[in-house]
Design a protein with these regions (language model features):
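A helix-centric hydrophobic-segment signal that preferentially recognizes long
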Residues: 2-182
Length: 182
């Protein structure tokens, strides 16, 4: 055997090892990005629930709306350890409760109350906007992981190991009435 064949085989083995190592490290970084984005989303969901609970307890809303918001916000705060599909449903319920409670009349009353209502309304709007952004970042990270894990080399060499395939977080988080008027 010629020396050039041996050098070529070693170079090819090094190249393959580098490719596998690079792919595994990239996939690990993407999974870490998903975990970080999930933590950020969780924190933003808690902030939104806390802001909603403060709004419910401020006294500027009618009793039925305040009770509905307080119940939905409390459910959201208690759902931190729930599985993802349950958490998605609970967070969507909180958004729906906000939509129902914050009708035109309630929004007008809150915006007029500059001492308490308007700042709390702005806090809920800002918290909801941060939830929307955090959810987008998470879903983008999940999409990137799924794209890399679909590659034949990653599947063939099982570079993902035993890591679960991450799932997107799908909730109703749009509150157009807060975006327009706040």
């Amino acid at each position: 055997m010629d020396l050039s064949w041996i050098v070529g085989a070693i170079a090819m083995a090094v190249l393959i090892a580098w490719y596998v190592s690079y792919g595994a490290a990239r996939l690990d970084r993407l999974h870490t990005r998903v975990e970080g984005a999930l933590s950020v989303l969780d924190a933003q969901l808690v902030r939104r629930a806390e802001a909603t609970l403060e709004l419910a307890n401020c006294g500027a809303l009618d009793a039925a709306s305040a009770l509905m918001l307080a119940g939905a916000a409390s459910d959201s705060l208690e759902a931190e350890s729930a599985d993802q599909s349950s958490r998605e449903a609970i967070e969507s319920d909180l958004t729906q409760a906000l939509e129902l409670a914050l009708g035109e009349e309630a929004l007008r009353r809150l915006r007029v109350d500059e001492a308490l209502g308007a700042p709390l309304l702005q806090r809920v709007a800002a918290a909801n906007q941060r939830v929307e952004l955090a959810r987008r970042f998470l879903n983008d990270a999940v999409t990137d992981v799924r794209r890399v894990r679909r590659k034949p080399g990653v599947r063939l060499l099982r570079l993902a190991g035993h890591a679960d395939l991450p799932q997107t977080f799908e909730i109703d988080d749009e509150l157009p009435m807060l975006v327009r008027g706040t």
